[in-house]
A protein has these predicted regions:
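Conserved binding/recognition cores within well-folded domains
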Residues: 2-94, 98
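Short, charged, intrinsically disordered terminal tails
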Residues: 110-111
Length: 115
């Protein structure tokens, strides 16, 4: 989405162009918010970029995924396992990363057939 600065319209670089070169073309597993940064979990490793989670999720059209927590977005095909216990769920990704599922998003994921 364009932003205004000094009367000029500036376009932000899309998420795919913000990725470090070594991660371009990698399968995106998850996005984790860390303060003002996002940690991208991919098939080629992880890296941080400066971007808001909501903006990044808005640019993921065509990739099936969902928020699992206020600070996590997960690609459905990246999930290797789901554990549930004590009223909580944890998603384990292909790379071994464990993603907490909040109660708020748990209902939505269950309704969508994720577990």
């Amino acid at each position: 989405m364009p932003t205004m600065r000094g009367g000029l319209r500036l376009r932000r670089r899309p998420l795919r162009l913000r990725l470090p070169l070594r991660l371009r073309g990698a399968e995106l597993y998850a996005i984790e918010a860390e303060d003002h940064y996002l940690r991208l979990h991919t098939s080629r490793g992880q890296d941080l970029i400066l971007m808001r989670l909501g903006d990044a999720v808005g640019e993921l059209e065509g990739l099936e995924g969902a928020q699992a927590h206020r600070s996590w977005w997960v690609a459905r095909r990246a999930i290797a396992d789901v554990r549930r216990g004590d009223g909580r769920a944890v998603l384990t990704l292909k790379d071994g990363t464990e993603v907490p599922v909040s109660r708020t998003y748990s209902r939505q994921l269950r309704a969508a057939g994720w577990y």
